[in-house]
Design a protein with these regions (language model features):
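N-terminal organellar transit peptides
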Residues: 1-85, 92-100, 111-287
């Protein structure tokens, strides 16, 4: 597509904000925005991340798209209040990373949770009859405890995903995998500590990151306009109070536009995310 304002774009900085838990809705929005940014030939992208992470596959797809785009423009990530786990992974797709001294980041690792309701079901007299093609077809079933072989299978899955995370951080930050593993044990740390560990490049605000992006693109930081690519919300969600999701991450892609209480809206979305990701490996910091 030929954009009528491409000349303006070449003198401006694109901006995308990633907030909330990363899921399918985040991925869809990000990929669409990155495609438009590429077509409009922006020279730089400011990637604002304020997310505790989310699903593994969606985080990986966003990272891959950023990697492809990095050959065509400069990308500077700005870590906000929290940029942990999958939020860190996405940030690895940038050329440079800026964090506030007090940013909560880290939580490099993988978590997988399932629910065991066996005792509750016994109390209410509910049981399930299962017919399956193999011994592991109902792994993480909520009506029974995991067997030792099942725990081994799931641990192997977690270990593979963890190794992928460590390798990406090591390559992006020019660190050895051994060094990354020394602090990639799920712990969180501040932006100041992240700088000491080599996870970020500088300490500073989003404005500092914007100015750096402008300089890298050969633009005047005092004159370069920043164009934000917001989530495209349906008209109803824009008109109804509380109609926007808890964050642009819109955890499961579901929203509750009829609710006028943002806190309740956010709680319902979180519960839906918990339900939909039970038994799914996550790059997510759970406070």
């Amino acid at each position: 597509m030929v954009w009528p304002f491409s000349r303006r774009s070449r003198k401006s900085i694109a901006r995308i904000e990633v907030t909330g838990v990363i899921g399918a809705a985040t991925r869809k929005r990000m990929l669409e925005a990155l495609k438009e940014i590429e077509e409009r030939r922006f020279p730089a992208l400011l990637l604002r991340i304020d997310s505790p992470g989310g699903t593994v596959g969606d985080s990986q797809e966003i990272y891959t798209a950023l990697q492809r785009l990095k050959d065509k423009l400069k990308i500077v990530a700005s870590f906000g209040n929290i940029s942990a786990s999958g939020g860190v992974y996405i940030g690895m797709g940038a050329n440079h990373i800026v964090a506030n001294p007090g940013t909560i980041t880290g939580s490099i690792g993988v978590i997988l949770r399932g629910n065991n309701l066996e005792r509750l079901l016994d109390k209410v007299g509910v049981s399930f009859k299962v017919i399956k093609s193999g011994p592991y077809k109902d792994i993480l079933a909520f009506d029974r405890e995991l067997t030792d072989p099942e725990k081994g299978i799931l641990q192997e899955l977690i270990d593979v995903s963890y190794s992928q995370f460590v390798k990406t951080v090591a390559e992006a930050r020019h660190l050895s995998e051994e060094t990354v593993r020394s602090f990639a044990d799920g712990r969180i740390f501040t932006g100041e500590q992240a700088l000491q560990l080599g996870v970020v490049d500088r300490l500073g605000s989003e404005e500092d990151a914007r100015r750096w992006a402008a300089e890298l693109a050969g633009l005047d930081p005092d004159k370069a306009e920043c164009i934000t690519f917001d989530e495209k919300k349906p008209l109803l969600r824009r008109l109804v109070p509380g109609g926007s999701s808890a964050g642009s991450g819109s955890m499961s892609g579901l929203a509750y536009p009829a609710l006028a209480i943002p806190a309740l809206n956010a709680t319902l979305e979180w519960l839906e995310f918990e339900r939909s990701t039970s038994g799914v490996p996550l790059w997510l910091y759970r406070p």
